[in-house]
Amino acid sequence: MPNNKFFVKSSKASLRWLGATVLLTLYALPSWAFSIDDVAKQAQALAAKGYEAPKSNVPSQFREMKFADYQQIQFNHDKALWHDLPTPFKIEFYHQGMYFDQAVKINEVTATAVNEVKYSSDMFNFGSVNHDPDAVKDLGFAGFKILYPINQLDKNDEIVSMLGASYFRVIGKGQVYGLSARGLAIDTALASGEEFPRFREFWIERPKANDKHLVLYALLDSPRATGAYRFVIYPGRDTSVDVQSRVYLRDKVGKLGLAPLTSMFLFGPNQPAMTMNFRPALHDSDGLSIHAGNGEWIWRPLNNPRHLSVSTFQVENPRGFGLLQRGRDFFQYQDLDDRYDLRSSGWVEPRGDWGKGHVELVEIPTNDETNDNIVAFWTPEKLPDVGQPLELAYRLHFSRDEDKIHSADFAYVKQTLRSAGDVKQTNLTRQPDGTTAFQVDFVGQPLKELDQAAPVTSQISVGDNADVVENSVRFNPVTHGWRLTLRLKVKDTKQPTEMRAALVNGDKTLTETWSYLLPANE
């Protein structure tokens, strides 16, 4: 028979310990935690009701100002968010002006609360821009930038810019801004016109003193879609951003572009400038790279076509895609002001299975470098039903080290050169023969390991709009790679011409697939 006195005493002691445990647990847990679920609730509620277009309260003087005047409006560094806190991250804000004429709400998330960051004109230096202080006292911010000592410990550098629609730009150590990422793209390149969703509200978590990453959230809104986003930013030699998103459709869309990247291509060795220019190339990116679910690597050099061009690449469960700047030598650009050799490449690394769909490349004609004319994104085969969440997770990499992005198992395209084809005559002169010629240099470890006498050959395919006049491969002693020469006779110059090529050694594929589109009227 049990000792009841012992049982009672033990029970009371256990209860006392249990009470202490519960008390400790309550004190150990945070009183609350902000998450993407909080933003998703707002996005879902917005999607269930009609779209309300944002209203602008920007005075006409600011809306109509020139870029040079807008540049004069600078944020006061000593007003930065967390200026006096022991964290390497600082937040500065953009003033409204020009086409940045819609205010976004920005909040700070702390361990205990969410507080809106209030606009004040005292935060800005207006330079020589004359303005009525009363007219701007309640304007609000156009966006924000994130500062971090990425290049040297005693200097804060801008590493992220959130400004305009759902655009954001990110750079790593030693990089300069080039291409942009976006939250969402809708109906890009459709005749009905593109819809540009915008981030209307942000929540930025206050980092701890030793945090090497920054977390922020965004609420996206547009006439036919809403979305909740979580970004975790890791500054470094290659800055990376983990993105988690939930998108809700208000209405049906023709095309949904996920993880979109936007860039610029004006001219380069594969499409020389139409007018004389001291720069050999002028672009933020020179190609689209795709790592397909089946392991194939594809490289599509970019063009500045005379007419809108849309290319699709059917890929199930992509392992990655991005717009890259493969040329990293200054002499390839010769631009001391804009330093295209330092522009970052952008790479999308999916998390989880994305299923069936395609990577789409949109190339838009442009006459100058101020227009972003290149867009790349993923489109799912099946769109979500209206009101149902579409969840997507991926990591964005911003890098100047393309070798880290590409697999060492395959050689890659170093450059694509295009010219009028010719034939060497008996007197050693070259006579044009009406063909279009391509020189494609492949480099990489699989080629370096080969003897220069190795029987490397090419596998090519060309569309119905051209005949192959020459297909040859030779060792390139300068790059320690191989150069493919193709000469094509285009049948109808008013039509585009597709071609693909890869190098092989017997039955072993040595390189990525070079996939080129010769635009119409070239």
Swiss-Prot record:
Localisation per UniProt entry: Periplasm
Keyword Membrane set for record: no
GO molecular function, one term: catalytic activity
UniProt keyword annotations, A-Z: Periplasm, Signal
An annotated GO BP: beta-glucan biosynthetic process
The protein's annotated pathway: Glycan metabolism; osmoregulated periplasmic glucan (OPG) biosynthesis
GO cellular component: outer membrane-bounded periplasmic space
InterPro entries linked to this entry: Gal_mutarotase_sf_dom (IPR011013), GH-type_carb-bd (IPR014718), Glucan_biosyn_MdoG/MdoD (IPR014438), Glucan_biosyn_MdoG_C (IPR007444), Ig-like_fold (IPR013783), Ig_E-set (IPR014756), MdoG_OpgG (IPR023704)
Gene3D superfamilies: 2.70.98.10, Immunoglobulins
Broad class of the protein's primary localization: periplasm
Domain of life: Bacteria
Signal sequence extent: 1-33
Pfam families: MdoG
Protein family per UniProt: Belongs to the OpgD/OpgG family.
Role summary: Involved in the biosynthesis of osmoregulated periplasmic glucans (OPGs).
Protein name (record): Glucans biosynthesis protein G
